[in-house]
Amino acid sequence: MKNRNGFSLVELLLVVAVILIISAIAIPNFLRSRERANEASAVASMRLINTAAVTYSVTYSNLGYPVSLTAMGGASPCTASSAQACLLDDVLAQGTKSGYSFALTGDGLVPSVSYLVTGTPQAVGSTGQRMFCTDQNSVIHYDSSGSGCTSASPTLD
């Protein structure tokens, strides 16, 4: 019998099978972790938007709450004005962050007395499972049914 170096085909197939089994277990857990991280980031962004909206309404009391996210943003270096208040980073002010799309809708009044912010996963099941919303009361609600988030939706604990 010859003295051969290396692995046999059976040994290589066993190693590949073990790697595939480990991958089948690890990858779904990784994806769920990423979804949870995106949802946590979305909730933090909603809180930041609420804080910025209140600051905006106090600073520009003649206008009330902002009419859009871009009104609270501004590229760095930023000079504050009612059209670009420099309260949010430019990424969030453009409406996307961590796999979520954000939108702020004002009430159309001057001064504005209410607003609604929504945070929607860009790819449901991949970037997040739940939609979030909040308004001038700063209570964050969520919807995981896909029917849309409203002030009647469950609140976060």
Task: Go through each PLM region and give its residues.
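A short, glycine- and basic residue-enriched loop/turn
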Residues: 4, 19, 34-37, 53
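A short acidic/small-residue loop/turn micro-motif
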Residues: 146-150
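Extracellular/periplasmic head regions of type IV pilus-like filament subunits
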Residues: 51-130, 134-139, 144, 155-157
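N-terminal hydrophobic or amphipathic segments with adjacent small-residue motifs
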Residues: 11-18, 36, 113, 132
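N-terminal single-pass transmembrane signal-anchor helix
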Residues: 2-30
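Alpha-helical interaction segments
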Residues: 19-21, 46, 90-92
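Aliphatic-rich helix starts adjacent to a transmembrane/signal segment
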Residues: 29-46
